[in-house]
Amino acid sequence: YMITEWEEFLDPYIQAVGELKIKLRGIRKQYRKQNRHSPIEFVTGRVKPIESIKEKMIRRGISYDTLEQDLQDIAGLRVMVQFVDDVQEVVSILHKRQDMRIIQERDYIKHRKASGYRSYHLIIEYTVDTINGSKTILAEIQIRTLAMNFWATIEHSLNYKYQGDFPEEIKERLEITARI
């Protein structure tokens, strides 16, 4: 793929992330207007950088032909909530929506990863309308509490620093922190 082809390929994903951020923030706004506790604290989103996509394709043996189906997190959104109960609340709100279809759910809160990582992941099908017609893409929505996010961020940084080979003491501390 040339850079211009990549840009063209990523356009619908960029559009989807923009639209989904507005829609998810809209949910928060509606709760606040009614003076109710919003399960959504804040929303971030990104499109995976081209280099990261290429790297993951090599690591997983994914071809360009199957890229759209096999790489489910090219478009990624993160929904932060205050409390663990809010996670399920957000999941049920998203299940009721007509403008997206949840095709996969991974509950790393109930079933935390060995590392202690906790988060709720949804893979959705989402359709964007472009001047060339409509295009359905896959996007990943991660829902987690602020504490889980803080933990995941630290774990990610440590992984980077120690190349995944943590000193035992840090590993123990991380596991204790993950339980909070």
Q: What residue spans do the PLM features occupy?
A:
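Long beta-strand-rich cores associated with HINT superfamily self-processing modules
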Residues: 68, 81-180
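Charge-rich, low-complexity segments
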Residues: 1-72
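Short amphipathic alpha-helical segments
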Residues: 73-77
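Short, structured coil/loop segments at alpha-helix boundaries
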Residues: 3-6, 10, 79, 164-167
